[in-house]
Structure formats: C-alpha cells, structure tokens
Curated annotation (Swiss-Prot):
Organism from which the protein derives: Cupriavidus necator (strain ATCC 17699 / DSM 428 / KCTC 22496 / NCIMB 10442 / H16 / Stanier 337) (Ralstonia eutropha)
Taxonomic lineage: Bacteria, Pseudomonadati, Pseudomonadota, Betaproteobacteria, Burkholderiales
Record GO terms (molecular function): 4-(cytidine 5'-diphospho)-2-C-methyl-D-erythritol kinase activity; ATP binding
Family: Belongs to the GHMP kinase family. IspE subfamily.
Protein name listed in UniProt: 4-diphosphocytidyl-2-C-methyl-D-erythritol kinase
Location of the active site: K20, D145
Signal peptide: none
Catalyzed reaction equations: 4-CDP-2-C-methyl-D-erythritol + ATP = 4-CDP-2-C-methyl-D-erythritol 2-phosphate + ADP + H(+)
One Gene Ontology biological process: isopentenyl diphosphate biosynthetic process, methylerythritol 4-phosphate pathway
Binding site for ATP: P103, M104, G105, G106, G107, I108, G109, G110, G111, S112, S113
InterPro entries assigned to the protein according to its UniProt record, in alphabetical order: GHMP_kinase_C_dom, GHMP_kinase_C_sf, GHMP_kinase_N_dom, IspE, Ribosomal_Su5_D2-typ_SF, Ribsml_uS5_D2-typ_fold_subgr
Gene expressing this chain: ispE
HAMAP family, per the entry: IspE
Length: 292
C-alpha cells in the first residue's frame, strides 16, 4: 500500500463539492475514438453538494445514503474511491454519505465534482499523499470534468477537457435556473446537427478581455433548446434580464451574471414558479484545495 503520511483522524465531514459553470463552450472537433475536443472556461461557484467520509479498515467502499436514480455501484463517488484504491494499493475503505442538492443532468458538474471531492478527501484520510497531478490523472479516467475540480481553480480547458490552464476571474454573482428537465449529455453530443468545427480560440484573447462573460457561445445550446422546450423557455426568460445569458455544459441549467448580489436576488424573486433557481457566488479556489 502507498502511504507517505501519518494517518489523520478517521472522519472527514462537511466536504463541499462545488458546481461549475461553463462561461463558454466551443466544440472544436471530434477524435477518432469518438470523444469531442472542446474549449471552455470553467467557473467554480458556491453551490455545493456536501460529502462526509469515515475511514474503514476492511477495504469496503460503501455509499451509506440513497441517491434517487443513481445505484451505488455506478455512482462516481464509489467509482472514484475504488479507482484510488486500484491506483495506490490502498487497503482502507470508506463509508461515504452525500447531501445531494446539485441537480443531475443540469450541466453543472455535480457528479464529477462529487468524484473529485472523494479523491481529495480519501487521499487525505488514507494518508496517501498523492500529488494533485496524479489525482487529476485518476479523475480523468472517471470523466472529463473531474480534473478541473481536483485542480481546484477556475480554468481554461482544451482537448477533451483535460488540458487545463488556471485563469483568474473577477468576483461575480450569477442567477442559475434549473428548468426541471434532465438533459442527457450523450444525446446532445451525438445529435447530427451539432457543429464540431468552431475555430480555436487563444487563451490570451480571453484573458485580455475586460468583460469575460460575453465571450464566445455554447455550441451545445441550440441543440438542447431545440430538443428540450423548458430549457429554451428558461433561457429566453433569463435573456430578458441579461442578453448574455446562456446554458452551461449540455444543459439543462442556464445562467447569467449580475453586477451584485442584490441585483441577482431581485431577478431571482421574479422567477416563474415552475422552475428552480438560485443566486450563486463565484469561487476563486475549491474549498478543499489545500488537501492536495
């Protein structure tokens, strides 16, 4: 077993798994293996699932809370823990509880963020001492969005999402709307109408912009809004309050930036009752960044 540190106390509670927003998302190509190449900027925000971990000595990894619609054996949290065991030979296990608030199929990275928090927390609880880059490598095998949460910073991403360059973004407030539709990512990426040839952008061009929140577009947005009417309606409603509102990821959530918390809250108070909405604040760093 790989161990380079003395063991900490056996329990780590109240571990945040923050959501992300894609400030833009350009599909730049498709590889021979079927994966799409992208360019995007990931913005971390303070809307979080919360995970709790207890170390076990018997090697068993158990999710001890129910997550509707997600069997434990396929949950990215369980898969992340087992991937860490496989990569290191760790003989410890863990009981993992999840307070799940981030919507699934929302395009905000909830499952990927839960997996990253699991890697960060168990690397600490099991006394493994793996470097952040190694945890990112393990995370990439679980999903293309996992590495940015392990990186723990806002980032410009390229490739399939694994080529990450940290970027500094201004403090911001966003209104995020979940129109209560689940959008399957695979269905959006496989649509024959999806354009896959957006020209590559240069990170310096994005970084030099005074307003970083009207850059580019989300290439998946026309597909998702054509297929899912509630996504289209939520986006149209939000555009009445900010013309640069857009979808994050492959949907279903849509978002817009506002100058301050009070303005964002005023918009949220007008939200039609059939949708869920939230006022969120940007994060410069992942709350668990110090664990790696």
């Amino acid at each position: 077993m790989h161990r380079s540190q003395p063991l900490p106390p056996p329990e780590l509670r109240d571990c945040p798994a923050p959501a992300k927003l894609n400030l833009f998302l350009h599909v730049t190509g498709r590889r021979a293996d079927g994966y799409h190449t992208l360019q995007t900027v990931f913005q971390l925000v303070d809307w979080c699932d919360t995970l709790h971990f207890r170390r076990r000595d018997d090697g068993v990894v158990a999710r001890v809370t129910d997550v509707p619609g997600v069997p434990a054996e396929t949950d990215l949290v369980v898969r992340a823990a087992r991937a860490l065991q496989a990569a290191t030979g760790a003989t410890f296990g863990a009981d993992i509880a999840i307070d799940k608030v981030l919507p699934m199929g929302g395009g905000i990275g909830g499952g990927s963020s839960d997996a990253a928090t699991t890697l960060l927390a168990l690397n600490h609880l099991w006394g493994l001492g793996l470097a952040r880059a190694e945890l990112m490598r393990i995370g990439l095998a679980l999903g293309a969005d996992v590495p940015v949460f392990v990186l723990g910073q806002n980032a410009f991403a390229q490739g399939i999402g694994e080529d990450l360059t940290p970027v500094e973004l201004p403090e911001s407030w966003f209104v995020v709307i979940h129109p209560k539709q689940h959008v399957p990512t695979a269905e959006i990426f496989s649509d024959e109408c999806l354009t896959r040839d957006t020209p590559l952008s240069i990170i310096a061009v994005f970084a030099a912009r005074t307003n970083k929140f009207d850059f580019g577009r989300n290439d998946l947005e026309p597909i998702a809004t054509a297929k899912f009417g509630e996504v289209a309606r939520a986006l149209a409603w939000l555009k009445q309050h900010n013309q640069h509102a857009r979808m994050t990821g492959s949907g279903a959530c849509v978002f817009a930036r506002f100058p301050d918390a009070a303005t964002a809250q005023q918009v949220l108070e007008r939200l039609p009752p059939e949708w869920d909405g939230r006022c969120v604040r940007s994060l410069a760093r992942h709350p668990l960044a110090a664990l790696a």
